[in-house]
Every structure is written in structure tokens, then in C-alpha cells.
């Protein structure tokens, strides 16, 4: 069942089983071009480094904006890193390495989306088609209304473009990592080193599903929030001797 006749005549297939040469498609459900896009990937990095007789350092910062090939996904990340090693005197050396990152991911393109592109017939429109007027239906703002295809025999109630427009699902990630050490040389070849590491991870997910269209319309939409924090640390002490 098409739900709507996609052709400009009532009987596009004759009694002989052949297509009527006058039959033309009113619309073309071009899901592939709607979902797959050639989009810009931007990545920028900058770094500084230096050293002298007692110390060396390295500092870097980066920005990534990767929209991917699917029009329904976005990813953005800010990151920075700093590394310092310092010889306090002949027998003591200290150092630290710290990295921070903040990223936001919204939308997703799962295996289900790929399978939809492979199997969704083009006779199923992306937007609702009005057979009476031979035009797409418009909302009160003059925008085309997405077709969730509740009449379809496959992919019923599915429209990833509509979900991306009406629903929001941003994931926010924050990561902090630090490695610090001090090293004592007692005699040539005999060293004591203490390493201390700290890792902090946090993510937040804020989901919103609209109340007007899609699977949540029947129960007036939904909203939910999820978050998690994790802090871990490790201390180890090493005594080594090399001839």
C-alpha cells in the first residue's frame, strides 16, 4: 500500500500488466540525497614547544567540527594539552602532563539509517503528499510536513529527517586527565620514581521527543536527562637500578 497514489493517473498499470506510457511520478522520495551530504570537516591545531638546560615544555590546542556525511549528525570538540619536565637539581626531576577536552555530539546515523537508505522505496515520499491538490501539504508556517508513513508496509512511523528536525538529543562529554611524577636519583643508576595519575570523565545527555509528530505523539512527547561522572586515580612507586 502506497497510502497515496504516487502517479498522475489512477491506473498506472494496465490490465496487460504493463506501465501506462502516460504515467508519471508526482514526486520522488529521494531519501539518499536528503540524508547523504558532502559536508565540510574542519580541524585546527596549534602548538608551542621549547626547552633549555633545565626544562622542556609542550602546549597544544585543537578544534574539530565534523558534520559527517549524514545530514542528521554533528560533532564538535575543543581540546588542549600541556606537558612540562623540570630538573630541579642534580638529583630531583619533576614533570606533569595535563589534557582537557569538551565535545558535543548530536544526532546519529546508525546501521538502521544505512539500511533505510538501501531498502526504502522511492514511492514513499519524505513529505506528505496531497493527492487532491497534487502538492505537498504545508503547515501553518508554510513548511512541508514530514511524512512518517504510518500506512507503509515497511518502515512505518519512520522518518529520520523529521526526527532530526523536531527532536533533540545532544551528548556532552568532558574529559580531564593528568599525569604527574617526581624522580629522585640517589646514586648514578639508582632511582626512585613516583607516578600519580588522575582521570575525570563526565557526560550529560538531554533528550527531547516532540509531542506533535512521530512515535511519541500518542503520549504527548517525552523529555529525559542522563548524566554520569567518574573519577579515578592511580599512584605507583618504582625503584630501579641500572648499571
Q: Which residue ranges define each predicted feature?
A:
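Outer-membrane beta-barrel architecture
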Residues: 47-49, 60, 83, 179-181, ...
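C-terminal beta-signal and adjacent terminal beta-strands/loops
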Residues: 29, 34-35
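Solvent-exposed "coupling" segments
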Residues: 40-46
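Periplasmic plug
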Residues: 58-60, 95
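Transmembrane beta-strand segments that form the barrel wall of outer-membrane beta-barrel proteins
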Residues: 61-67
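Surface-exposed loop/interface segments of Gram-negative outer-membrane beta-barrel transport/assembly proteins
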Residues: 1-27, 38, 68-75, 79-177, ...
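A generic beta-sheet turn/junction motif
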Residues: 50-54, 63
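Outer-membrane beta-barrel channels and translocator barrels
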Residues: 41, 52-53, 89, 185-189
